[in-house]
Amino acid sequence: MSLEVNIEKKLDGFILRAAFSAGNTPTALLGASGCGKSMTLRCIAGIVKPDKGRIMLDGRVLFDSEQHIDLPPQQRGAGLLFQNYALFPNMTVEQNILCGLKAEKDRAARQARCAELLRAMRLEPLAKRYPAQLSGGQQQRTALARILAGRPRILMLDEPFSALDSYLREAVESEVGSLLAGFDGTALLVTHNRDEAYRLCPEMVVLDSGRVLRSGHTRDIFADPRSITAARLTGCKNILPCTRLDAHAVRLTGWDVPLQLALPVPEGCTAVGIRAHDFVPCDAGAPNALPVAALSSSENPFDWNLICTAPDGTARLWWKVSKSTLFSPAPVPPHFLCAAPESIMPLTN
């Protein structure tokens, strides 16, 4: 199955221009809050009408402004999980799921499908409970069961973990990951959390202010985000201004030190990205060695954060050091840090 999206929609402050494709592999839409991710899902589902463009699912046109095609939501085969799950509060778990089976006229078939979903989503003991009597994870499973009842051809999850307490997220995320991996169709996950996107989706689309900055394999995007915004969205803490020297070298501003890169440096390169875990202490003569002075440190349960500066104090970088145990002491501040050429990412504006 495949999804093709190429639409425009005028929003407050910017124009959404979403152009991407997705196949049978779970795909994340990663971006900051308000960048147009959720609106894109609503346009695909038929809840919101784009100003122009085209949406196709498995070769079937869902929306085409030029041909004046705009299928209603019921005919699109799209299942959309809202952030708040949108369960009917006065209906039981079983009744909520049956609402997703209204198109099935045969009562016995409806009951059989409902029973199948109750078993699959481990909701059988909760069938007669109301949403207010459920945990956040149970509410989510109920909402997913209702969506899956109609056998959608595309499954779209809008920030599915935002309403969950942190201690529940890991368990629920594992369940959602299994669901996405086993879903026989196109699956989209909207998130602003880079870790969720990386763990759950082998494919990714990065959006900023309504524009698609980068799309492709998730690992490829993390390794080479290409733009400063995409690098920040994927969690890169060190965005260091530079000038291009040649096809594989730059000079860092603040250090006046040349760095060698494995990736080609484009003509428009204005910065490099180096992830905080990719720095290692080194000697002054090591390749890509940067002289640093420790400014501050902070401790997390499983790593240390050190903020270092250039010798003149004008530029800063983050260095993350994993802890071997909970009580590992702070690392000794180094005089030099370096990063391998393969770990340095050329970035443009």
What residue ranges belong to the model's regions?
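Non-catalytic connector elements of ABC transporters
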Residues: 5-26, 32, 38-39, 46-49, ...
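ABC ATPase nucleotide-binding domain helices that frame the ATP-binding cleft
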Residues: 38-41, 141-142
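The short alpha-helix immediately C-terminal to the Walker A/P-loop
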Residues: 42-43, 203
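Catalytic "switch" loops of ABC-type ATPases
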Residues: 47, 78, 82-88, 193
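A position-specific signal in ABC ATPase nucleotide-binding domains
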Residues: 48-49, 56, 102, 181
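ABC ATPase NBD Q-loop/coupling interface
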Residues: 54-76
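ABC ATPase nucleotide-binding domains
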Residues: 77, 92-229
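C-terminal boundary and immediately downstream tail of ABC-type ATPase nucleotide-binding domains
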Residues: 222-245, 273
